[in-house]
Structures are given as C-alpha cells and as structure tokens.
Amino acid sequence: VKTFRTIHVVKQPVDRVYEAVRDRLPEIAAMLDDVESVRMLERKAGAGGGLSLVNEWRARLPLPRVLDDLVHKDSLGWIDRACWDDRGRRCAWEIEPLFLPGQIRCRGTTEYEAAMGGRGARVTFAGQIEITLGARGTIRGPLDQTVSSVVESIVTTVVPRNFRKTLDGACALIERPSRS
C-alpha cells in the first residue's frame, strides 16, 4: 500500500471552491490537459445534506510502452465514486480504473477548510493505492513489478498534479463573470 497527500491553498472562499469542484467537475475537466472528459453517471442526494456522485473520467496520457498490451486507449480512464459531506466540507472518494479491473484499489479523502482569514481555502487531498497484479493472475513475473511501479507513479504523481489543476480550474470558473 502506497500513500500520497498534497495540500493546496487557493485565493477563493472555501464554500465556493467546494461547490465548484462538487458541482462543476465536467466544466473544470475541460481545462485539464491530461483529461479528455468527465461524465456524471449518477447523482444522489444523501441524508443530512450529503451527496453521492459517480463520474466517469477519460484520460489522455502518454503511457510507457510496457503498458501498451495491458492498457488499451479505450480503457484509459476510471470511475470516481465520491460521497460529499456538505456539513464537514469533506469528500470521501474511491477510484476504480477501467484497466486491470479488480487489481488496483485507490481511495482517499479531500478536505476543504477556510484559510487566509476566510478569503481562501486550504484543500488537503490524501489517499492510498494498493496494487495486486500477480495475485489475480493477469500479470506475473518481472513485468508485475514494472507495471506496479508505473501505475503507482501515475496515481501518486499525475492524480495529485491534476487535482491542483482542478482547483485552479474551479477558481477560474468562480472568477468568471456570470452570464445571466
């Protein structure tokens, strides 16, 4: 199990950042270089002001050649299941890659807190990834470690980097004048 954590502070009020990321993710995704699209599959209101969202992400990432036979372009993406707690400004999430199903577990939380005297937001994105390639029989031998290392690198480097870009996109949407 490998853990990752990143903290970002942005110059927008925490409630506006939280709501933009929760409610406008497909718009924000259009601003991300590594993301082709985000499509909402499910949105359910939960008890106590919570919200459950399921999104399908499609990525456009250059992959190492070692993954060519394992990851086809049409499976380069993931399902994101998120439970948003509006009272605590917290999101618990789980990512299920479309490639190597059942062999990669990635989950974590995103916490939104007021910063800069209420004029900004401090966002903590943290999680863990567990890869069990050889245990499922799909990949065995020396390739197992290579693929595990590449997938770990993508999740622990690309995902947090894209989260920073997601926050930047949310701030850009907040700053845009409304078209009403």
Features from the language model and the residues they span:
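Beta-strand/loop substructures that line and gate deep hydrophobic ligand-binding cavities in soluble
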Residues: 53-54, 78, 83, 92-153
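Short strand-connecting beta-turns/loops that link adjacent beta-strands
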Residues: 48, 87, 117-119
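Helix-adjacent hinge/juxtasegments
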Residues: 62-86
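Hydrophobic ligand-binding cavity/cleft-lining segments
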Residues: 1-66, 72
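Hydrophobic pocket/interface hotspot
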Residues: 17-21, 125, 170
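Soluble, non-transmembrane catalytic domains of enzymes that act on hydrophobic metabolites at membranes
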Residues: 1-4, 8, 40-45, 98, ...
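Hydrophobic, Leu/Ile/Phe/Ala-enriched alpha-helical segments that form helix-helix packing faces
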Residues: 25-28, 32, 82, 166, ...
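A conserved amphipathic terminal alpha-helix motif
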Residues: 140-180
